[in-house]
Design a protein with these regions (language model features):
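Conserved beta-strand hairpin/beta-sheet module of binuclear metal-dependent hydrolase folds
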Residues: 1-46
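Active-site HxH/HxHxD metal-binding segment of metal-dependent hydrolases
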Residues: 35-83
């Protein structure tokens, strides 16, 4: 049976909650905050490939790490439509 592992990081000056969901060396980040280096180090040390980033909203404290993460992992970023 496959197991999902959910890890919580509290990141940045706003103490943003970031969640990493892991399964079979693949992972998804939810609201990666502004600490790309910390997240990249964790992913590397745990032999995880980042397959997607999900954003609950576009505030600065939730999206600061996106450029570095997308550049390194070439993964899609998902966010709701603007109305």
């Amino acid at each position: 049976m496959e197991r999902l592992i959910i890890k919580k990081f509290v990141l940045g000056i706003m103490s943003t909650n970031c969640y990493l969901i892991e399964n079979n060396n693949h992972s998804i980040l939810i609201d990666p905050g502004d600490k790309a280096e910390l997240l990249i180090n964790y992913l590397t040390q745990n032999n995880l490939q980042l397959t997607a980033i999900l954003l609950t909203h576009g505030h600065f404290d939730h999206i600061g790490a996106i450029d570095e993460l997308v550049e390194k992992y070439n993964c899609p970023v998902y966010i709701h439509q603007v109305r």
